[in-house]
Amino acid sequence: MALPIIVKWGGQEYSVTTLSEDDTVLDLKQFLKTLTGVLPERQKLLGLKVKGKPAENDVKLGALKLKPNTKIMMMGTREESLEDVLCPPPDNDDVINDFDIEDEVVEVENREENLLKVSRRVKEYKVEVLNPPREGKKLLVLDVDYTLFDHRSCAETGVELMRPYLHEFLTSAYEDYDIVIWSATNMKWIEAKMKELGVSTNANYKITFMLDSAAMITVHTPRRGLIDVKPLGVIWGKFSEFYSKKNTIMFDDIGRNFLMNPQNGLKIRPFMKAHLNRDKDKELVKLTQYLKEIAKLDDFLELNHKYWERYLSKKQGQ
């Protein structure tokens, strides 16, 4: 059962509507981090008590006997100033200095131990199909953080951090592609983000299913050691009658995520500093056109998505 809560912090009120009585105090703090930028360990939620003592992180919200729309005061400060929060973390070379995967592809993509891990995911990972795959449609796999959503900046609602033209992009893509969301977080937060952005409830398109970090595998690379990647083989193994290397494309801002299937990956420019770039970012407009162009093809393997803008410019100039 949903448990709406209003949290007051920094002179503003934040509405929390995606949690239930089965979620914990820590879940609430994690969600508040996405809204305010205050780390869970820095948060002090006044008034949350059990038997007269402050509620621990593992206490379920239902045990607090809160009435719907209860107002809670939060104390705590962000680690950085707002400008710092708007910037990517300084040690996050996933985005800034994402390594060139081309040198390591051959060693990783076909290594037997990695293929065995993919096979294990195909057998063991449970996919909840939200809408059935459609015959004859191609497959678009989308990352979330920095691809569809600026997850580092602070805002009152997720909509303020949504990448411009997201719904128009998904509406157009849905005409030719089944859409899958794959984020390197847990499913609870993927579902919360999709609800907050209005993706899971939009009437103009449907999400076929969503994958979380449990569908990923760890591979060893000579230069970077162990890294987590998103192997599309998990999807192809589970839905072989619909999807394959020939009809699948994946957008991600981190190139290493398609180390197991480099030819199917398109490295999108990360959407950061939403407050500054919301009016300038046109990435999804151009990618809408690219997806429409390549949807005419029978085999995506003849494409090099690294040069997608060049391909689009050439096609539009004909």
Curated annotation (Swiss-Prot):
GO BP: regulation of proteasome assembly
Reactions mediated catalytically: O-phospho-L-seryl-[protein] + H2O = L-seryl-[protein] + phosphate; O-phospho-L-threonyl-[protein] + H2O = L-threonyl-[protein] + phosphate
EC number: 3.1.3.16
InterPro entries: FCP1_dom, HAD-like_sf, HAD-SF_hydro_IIID, HAD_sf, Ubiquitin-like_dom, Ubiquitin-like_domsf, UBLCP1
Subcellular location: Nucleus
Origin superkingdom: Eukaryota
Residues that coordinate or bind Mg(2+): D143, D145, D253
PROSITE patterns: FCP1 (PS50969), UBIQUITIN_2 (PS50053)
A GO CC term attached to the entry: nucleolus
Residues the record lists as N6-acetyllysine modifications: K117
Biological role: Dephosphorylates 26S nuclear proteasomes, thereby decreasing their proteolytic activity. Recruited to the 19S regulatory particle of the 26S proteasome through its interaction with 19S component PSMD2/RPN1. Once recruited, dephosphorylates 19S component PSMC2/RPT1 which impairs PSMC2 ATPase activity and disrupts 26S proteasome assembly. Has also been reported to stimulate the proteolytic activity of the 26S proteasome.
Protein name in the entry: Ubiquitin-like domain-containing CTD phosphatase 1
Gene that produces this protein: Ublcp1
